[in-house]
Design a protein with these regions (language model features):
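Transmembrane alpha-helices of multi-pass eukaryotic membrane proteins
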Residues: 2-6, 286-300, 350-362, 382-399, ...
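Interhelical loop segments of eukaryotic multi-pass membrane proteins
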Residues: 25-32, 311-337, 370, 377-391, ...
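Soluble extramembrane domains flanking the early transmembrane region of eukaryotic membrane proteins
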Residues: 11-293
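Hydrophobic alpha-helical transmembrane segments corresponding to the first two to three helices
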Residues: 274-447, 474-483
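Cytosolic juxtamembrane regulatory segments of multi-pass membrane proteins
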Residues: 330-344, 495-511, 587-589, 651
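Hydrophobic alpha-helical transmembrane segments
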Residues: 229-245, 332-342, 370-374, 399-413, ...
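Membrane-embedded alpha-helices of multi-pass membrane proteins, especially ion channels
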Residues: 10-21, 299-312, 362-378, 398-411, ...
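TerminUS-proximal long segments
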Residues: 249, 601-651
Length: 651
């Protein structure tokens, strides 16, 4: 009951707790009233540009836009660096409640015979063709691009396009469909003008909140990008009838003038609710409520059935076995009791099983702690990069748990190569992850992407692994091997029992296929939204739902694996160690198939490098998910088998 109430609280706070960690509002004042605590200048920061057609993001200055000195750039945390965020100051001059109309920003000139100018123009064209998106920030709020989609719904996105492209057959793509003037075949229209609408809450007369006059707080920022062909910076025309600015690589010189307009508009929306309009416009958000509850009802119903079957059947079996032990005419054991002398026989490759279970325990605890903190709003989208930073720090700290569990399990399975176990626990899985990460980082370096982790950060990550995670693993392993071995409730025979011929449904592969489908059915809806947040750059904030799905995943993995293990034991197959891990871990195979389906049906990613990067990152995700779900099934089965063989009398 307490867990259920906690989840309800999480569901509530996941929607409204964006500013719990102390992200204080900033008050802005008019120029005459400005001070250190109430500034007049409203800085606009630019971030990376990314695309749903490419996995490779770029820094703002990689394209030939208007820039200023980057000395005053905000310091990114580790999570922001790993996600490729590069927040930089911009040349846009915005002041509180100061409207501007068609202000000149900068001028870019391209000479026909200059190879560097042609390269810059071609990069702009490539960005427009792949629909690269700006990510601007004002007062820690994303600058949003709002439009009406084909279903006549108003959608607001936390990014806006740098331009658009019209195909050679005259078909407008992406943002070109929003204006019928973008109609010239095989043309690139650069959005060199932006109309910025800033909605603010006026606090200057709110005496209940402040004992001194303040101006207001920024609530919403919306932008309308446009393409305008300016001829002279002294005679700018930003009207609705302005001619668009196509970008072409020709033998003629070309000039591009960048301009902007700013309009301030008061609103009654409170500062604490300023994210709502972005979150409410996320596609399919409302569908999630019904789908999650529907899945919850189905899964709980199936879990209840499985639980009752197991409890009633086991209760009858245990009572019958104990009754037969008291009867003098009991000639032969049968059922799962028949394999009591082999059920705790150490498996093959016990070393790798212990390493996988240790790392899986580390991942499960990290996920649990991260979700518990996130569902209360402390790792919200308003706190950029905090989710990845928090998860990575806890992954490193929980290395001590990985070492302890791996060592304790390996000792329980009568393993002798304790040094190898310690080294594999510390280096095997992290080494695979770092190897894939390093190769993908080389690809991003070659593409000069903002997602390429700088050398200093790479050294820092390597140091975290070698000088913090590894010693913690050694410490955990020391205490794991120092502890007593878990004693099995029954003795193990010296000669292994021969496993009889198995039926189709008790063979390993059919069992894994059946054991993985139910847990996957619990997560695939949430998986769609998670993949959208990663690859379609949508905001993900329903951590309360994710925590609930995580709990359901644990329950279904446990019960499905226990049920299949019971059937295998009844069929006199005692090889449950690896099978319990692989049965629930096979959920990762369905996850990988779904990621392939998502790639082919939902994404429009083009290019070999982007495809390689997508499946490399997917491979990391699937591998970690395999370890986590496999660990759930293993521990559930281990506790189940230990319990049932402790409940029967064995001579």
């Amino acid at each position: 009951m307490k867990s259920f109430l906690l989840l309800l609280v999480c569901l509530t706070y996941s929607l409204d707790a964006f500013y719990l960690p102390g992200l204080a509002p900033v008050n802005f004042c008019e120029k005459e009233q400005s001070s250190n605590t109430c500034p007049n200048a409203v800085p606009l920061f630019v971030n990376k540009l990314d695309s749903d057609q490419s996995v490779i993001p770029y820094e703002y200055h990689s394209f030939d836009f208007c820039t200023v000195s980057e000395e005053d750039s905000p310091v990114e945390n580790l999570g922001q660096v790993l996600f490729g965020e590069r927040i930089r100051p911009s040349p846009y001059n915005i002041s509180f409640i100061e409207n501007k109309q068609c202000s000149f920003l900068c001028e870019k000139e391209y000479k026909s015979g200059d190879a560097e100018d042609k390269r810059r123009l071609k990069l702009l064209q490539r960005g427009m063709k792949l629909n690269y998106q700006h990510h601007w920030i004002i007062d820690n709020m994303p600058v949003s691009f709002c439009f009406t989609n084909q279903q006549q719904f108003n959608v607001c996105l936390p990014s806006f396009p740098m331009g658009c492209y019209v195909t050679p057959d005259g078909r407008p793509k992406d943002a070109c469909v929003l204006d019928n003037r973008y109609d010239k075949p095989d043309s690139y229209y650069l959005f060199n003008h932006v109309d910025i609408l800033v909605e603010y809450r006026d606090l200057s007369h709110d005496s209940n909140m402040f004992d001194h006059k303040v101006g207001g707080r920024v609530i919403r920022i919306k932008v309308i990008p446009r393409s305008i062909k300016h001829t002279d910076k002294n005679s700018l025309n930003c009207g609705e009838t302005a001619v668009p600015q196509p970008i072409s690589v020709t033998d003629e010189n070309m000039k591009v003038l960048y301009t902007y307009s700013v309009m301030w508009k008061p609103t009654d929306v409170k500062w604490s609710s300023r994210w709502d309009y972005l979150l409410d416009s996320i596609p399919h958000t409302n569908i999630q409520w019904f789908s999650i509850m529907n899945s919850l009802v189905i899964v709980l119903f199936l879990s209840g059935m499985v639980g009752m079957i197991l409890l009633r059947t086991l209760h009858r079996d245990i009572a019958r076995y104990n009754q037969l032990d008291n009867e003098e005419d009991a000639q032969e054991e049968f059922g799962w009791k028949l394999v009591h002398g082999d059920v705790f026989r150490p498996p093959q490759s016990a070393m790798f099983l212990s390493v996988f279970v240790g790392t899986g325990t580390q991942l499960l605890l990290m996920s649990s702690i991260t979700l518990a903190v996130a569902c209360f709003g402390f790792l919200s989208p308003a706190n950029r990069g905090s989710l990845m930073t928090f998860a990575l720090v806890w992954y490193v700290l929980l290395s001590v748990v990985s070492g302890y569990v791996s060592a304790r399990l390996y000792k329980t399975m009568e393993g002798l190569a304790w040094k190898t176990n310690i080294l594999l626990t510390a280096f095997f899985v992290p080494g695979i992850l770092f190897g894939i990460f390093f190769v993908t980082n080389l690809m991003l370096w070659a593409k000069e992407s903002s997602a390429a982790v700088p050398f200093g950060t790479l050294v820092a990550l390597l140091s975290l692994w070698l000088f913090l995670a590894t010693p913690l693993t050694f410490i955990g392993s020391f205490f794991g091997f120092k502890g007593d071995r878990v004693i099995a409730p029954v003795r193990t025979n010296q000669i292994p029992r021969q496993v009889p011929e198995q039926t189709l449904y008790t063979k390993p592969l059919p069992g894994m296929l059946m054991g993985g489908i139910l847990p996957f059915g619990c997560i695939f809806i949430q998986l769609f939204f998670i993949l959208n947040s990663i690859w379609a750059h949508q905001v993900y904030y329903m951590f309360g739902f994710l925590a609930l799905v995580f709990l359901i995943l644990i329950v279904t993995c446990s019960e499905a694996t226990i049920l299949l293990a019971y059937f295998h034991l009844c069929a006199e197959d005692y090889h449950w160690w690896w099978r319990s891990f692989l049965t629930s871990g096979f959920t990762a195979a369905y996850l990988f198939l779904y990621c392939i389906h998502y790639f082919t049906s939902k994404l429009t990613i083009t290019g070999t490098i982007s495809t390689i990067l997508y499946f490399a990152y997917t491979g990391i995700f699937v591998f970690l998910f395999f370890l986590a779900t496999g660990t759930i099934g293993f521990f559930a089965t281990y506790l189940f088998i230990h319990k049932i063989y402790s409940s029967v009398k064995v001579d």
